[in-house]
């Protein structure tokens, strides 16, 4: 959070307020005592299904196979386009006019699992990464509840991804925010919107770093 202070996520706050147990494993690796303990804790819940969204850990196959119906991932793109860590930002940077949400059955690959459900969202000419994130977040509750209400049917009709159509949304790094003024104006405009709020576009003026908040 602000001031580099740790704060609970909204999900954790709601769970604690309703006396729902919260587990926050730091690893699932078999090579560590913490990882083995986390796997054992997961098994004690005997989960029917797990839902994963923007989770920071790689889930090994042993974890993916623990729930009766496996693990579902809510991914912020229309797979197989923009697999990976930063699909919203990369869609904006590339000038895509549409993106969306995909609910997929997780496997050992990186966003490579079979697709159960997709819903599209148009990208407006003034969308930033922040505004597009919020528009897509509004789609998630309906999407995942729709799938869970008839999970067996959606899993039976799951569609395999076409790997030949896949591309990857690489994780953002801060230096991507520096504006290269030799680029076309359209590319710079997308850079400003696609990197708002983080890492943010910037340039240097008289030796000083200056934030670029918008284009005209």
Feature annotation, model-predicted:
Residues 1-197, 208:
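One-carbon transfer enzymes
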Residues 205-216:
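Short, solvent-exposed recognition patches
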